[in-house]
Amino acid sequence: MNKPKKVAILTAGGLAPCLSSAIGSLIERYTEIDPSIEIICYRSGYKGLLLGDSYAVTPKIRENAALLHKFGGSPIGNSRVKLTNVKDCIKRGLVQEGQDPQKVAADQLVKDGVDVLHTIGGDDTNTAAADLAAFLAKNDYGLTVIGLPKTIDNDVFPIKQSLGAWTAAEQGAQYFQNVVAEYNANPRMLIVHEVMGRNCGWLTAATAMEYRKLLDRSEWLPEIGLDRAAYEVHGVFVPEMEIDLAAEAKRLREVMDKVDCVNIFVSEGAGVDAIVAEMQAKGQEVPRDAFGHIKLDAVNPGKWFGEQFAEMIGAEKTLIQKSGYFARASASNVDDIRLIKSCADLAVECAFRRESGVIGHDEDNGNVLRAIEFPRIKGGKPFDIDTPWFVQMLAGIGQSKGARVEVSH
């Protein structure tokens, strides 16, 4: 055992319902094992690391770390910073001209006396951590980097279940449980529920499934119009599945004629290629973030789907609602807390043996929970549309399963 003297924690990327709980779990576990180990938390992710801006974890914080399980977001703050995007780091004032952000980060860790860095984030955060770990190893810094996999998209290779995704699906379902009643407000209403998920439909599919569980647990009174058919999910559209717009419009028009409303769940990554092609044809700029990803909130897939379907199904009013920020900022649910604690416990164990990697259930190694080697971590894992529960759900709502589509990341 090679006990660390000082560890650092940072959270980065977009929010997910696990960040606060993961911070709390790491602080709790280190305190249980050896409270003499110093802990700091970098403020606003890699930004704080580059600027040397951190919180010291005091005895009071250790005593009250359990409070973090009750909150969403990240109390220590996030940012989207790519250490290998030198131009962006300079533009944002995080490093000076001529500086290498990776070296600045590495030197700051040494200056702060950090032995182990815990990064909590998605594929971008952990690929950034992988780059940093490789830089540290190549230049003999002797620091250990251990990642925890956060993403509501559940799209990280080769990790079976990323932290926060279960909660996000549950919260998205609860969000739509309120929104759906808007169909009462107008005849022939089309409600489009846009769910987060860049190039992965897992969250959209899982949210629809969780929402239908809520419907299963409800009592109905169709005699006065309280009919499950009107509250039902009528269509689920994900990037990995081909969409026959004409056939779906015909099917959904029949639903509209029968129940006076249509409710569809759309992944924010569905139809993006078509939307981007439209924008470029019009000479419009496609906005991207520091990692080169298209800014999906600017592209607005839900609006596009609404426009495509509205006329074809005879909708009098179209309502587009996005559950993403509501879902991703939630506190962790019981299932996620259990997963987070098991991952955090192993992360601390790995810290004591100085084993770098990303903690997760390794799909290529029998789903064993382990520190997965950084070079094997990558984003863009597609949702398997042949997953039995998804196939059953499509059959249950009367939607034909489209052909598989290869998605780019």
UniProtKB/Swiss-Prot annotation:
Pathway: Carbohydrate degradation; glycolysis; D-glyceraldehyde 3-phosphate and glycerone phosphate from D-glucose: step 3/4. Diphosphate binds at G14. Gene3D superfamilies: 3.40.50.450. The record marks D124 as: Important for catalytic activity and substrate specificity. GO terms for molecular function: 6-phosphofructokinase activity; diphosphate-fructose-6-phosphate 1-phosphotransferase activity; metal ion binding. Mg(2+) binds at D123. The record marks K150 as: Important for catalytic activity. It catalyses: beta-D-fructose 6-phosphate + diphosphate = beta-D-fructose 1,6-bisphosphate + phosphate + H(+). GO terms for cellular component: cytoplasm. Non-allosteric. The keyword Ligase does not apply. GO terms for biological process: fructose 6-phosphate metabolic process. Its EC number is 2.7.1.90. Its cofactor is Mg(2+). PANTHER family: ATP-DEPENDENT 6-PHOSPHOFRUCTOKINASE 1. NCBIfam families: PRK06555.1 (NF005121). This is Pyrophosphate--fructose 6-phosphate 1-phosphotransferase. The lineage of its organism: Bacteria, Pseudomonadati, Pseudomonadota, Gammaproteobacteria, Methylococcales. The gene is pfp.
